[in-house]
Design a protein with these regions (language model features):
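Membrane-interface interhelical connector segments
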Residues: 58-78
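Extended, low-polarity transmembrane helix blocks
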Residues: 2-58, 77-85, 89-92, 96-174
Length: 174
């Protein structure tokens, strides 16, 4: 049964709310609307990477290098700077929709390293409720869920395009 048949069936049964909802959602699936889907992905992925890069930079690259050394990453000072630069420049590029397929590769590498060296031992979930004390929730270390979400968003942008209002979009038009 296709969407049209399902809608007609629901109309006959008197489910007007469903019909209104399905027609509203069908509007979102139109190609003229769907092209805009890349913009919220670009905004959250770009901002997220930049926020993490700025956090590492503000605490000092040496502090991040010490963490990398502790978990056994080779050349921790070099890798700290490469990670920070990847997060800042890659995040800005994704935010602007510039060279997204190119910058996604080092960004994905950062995510894979973080997932394998930090988050994997804590399982999938990004939220681990440990306890509630004095009316306050205490959470444990996050799992690899957010790494996978970021990777999925990057893949969607690479395979689906950066969307309108992106530097990549204007470069393709020329």
């Amino acid at each position: 049964m296709n969407m049209g048949q399902l809608t007609q069936s629901m109309e006959r049964e008197g489910s007007s709310r469903f019909v209104f909802l399905s027609r509203g959602l069908a509007f979102l699936a139109r190609p003229s609307v769907a092209v805009w889907a890349a913009i919220p992905l670009r905004l959250i992925v770009g901002y997220g990477f930049m926020a993490h890069g700025f956090a590492k930079l503000s605490r000092g690259p040496e502090a991040f290098a010490a963490i990398l050394h502790t978990i056994g990453v080779p050349a921790p000072h070099l890798m700290a700077w490469l990670t920070i630069l990847t997060e800042l420049t890659g995040g800005l590029a994704v935010l602007l929709g510039a060279f997204v397929p190119l910058v996604s590769l080092p960004m994905a590498a950062v995510l894979f390293v973080a997932m394998l060296t930090v988050h994997l031992p804590y399982g999938f979930s990004s939220i681990k409720l440990l306890s509630v004390t004095s009316g306050r929730a205490q959470f444990g270390p996050p799992g690899y869920e957010l790494d996978l979400l970021y990777l999925a968003c990057l893949a969607a942008l690479v395979f689906g395009g950066s969307g309108p209002m992106a530097i990549d979009h204007y470069r393709r038009k020329k």
